[in-house]
Amino acid sequence: MVTFINLILGKKLGWSTVKIAASDLTDNALETTPKRLFYEIVLYSFAIEFVGAVILSFVFVPDFGALGIFEAIFLSVSAFCNAGFDLLTATPGAVGLSEYTNNPLVMITLIVLITTGGLGFIVWRNIRHYNKTKRLLLHTKLVLIMAAVMLFVGAAIIFIVEFSNQDTLGQMPVGEKILTSIFLSASSRTAGFPCFDMNDLMPFTKIIITILMFIGAAPASTAGGIKITTVALVVCTVISVLKGREDTYLMGHRIKRDAIYKTFTVIVLSLTLIAVSFTGILMCCEGMSLQKTIFEVVSAFSTTGFSVGASAEMNVPAKLIMVFTMLAGRIGPVTLMTSLIIRKNHNSDKNRILPEGNILVG
């Protein structure tokens, strides 16, 4: 957002700004001028949101008249940005998204918007220029595979667990159950559109949604969480260790150790932030449900917005902790900590040669 405002004001952007804004990306992704890169992001975003709004208008205009145009635009932007705001609950004559779970056009459009926003602009740009380059970046391949796996595995678990739950999927036809399960799986990775009361979900489903919220979507996207690439690298690293390899390999590539270090740093700092916030809220509010509290904290960290009602029961100090958790989760724990701790001159260690040390682990 700061970068976009600077462009509007005509200020120049240096590569240092771009590197900071796109620190999660590969160097190959930045083979363009800074200004063009950010103009492409804005253009892609508006184009996708416009198409989504037009499609949703075919449903909302007949239902709400001229107000339906605004509803379609707002919901399209909200879905693409993974914001999760839904004005349908405040619209006369509407109940909310739960009223449209039987409408494939609305559900599929929102799923596509949420998923597209969660892929990240580097993936859009790589796909758009595929005809010229004739190759996909390793980052793009990994994001597309992980996004599909997370979406459909999450949907399958939700479908199976909630199949007979009369408060959620139980009374729906099979086709609607499948589509709603996919929608809830997509929404759980930081979009936060509820299609029914989250308290009505089975306990195991809440655990799965908590995991999906914690993971989130892709780096450099509109979503939060620790990111799907982080999870993929952890899995690959564990497999490499079990196979006795010194390096981590993924799709025929050897992953840089810096990326592995950052991966585990992200997870440790994220879990630490969640644990500290969770403990702080329990200390501030006696009698809070453990399951509800951890659900709310992870939802805040990933900026998903799902709630089981625990936030309304919190006092002011606990709510301030939630605000800090949302802010830290949105900025990113690594970015936040490095900006506070790391000094500008960090090259001194590169010239130091120290003896190796062996420590027993596990």
Go through the PLM ranges and name each one:
Residues 1-362:
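Membrane-proximal intracellular helices of multi-pass ion channels
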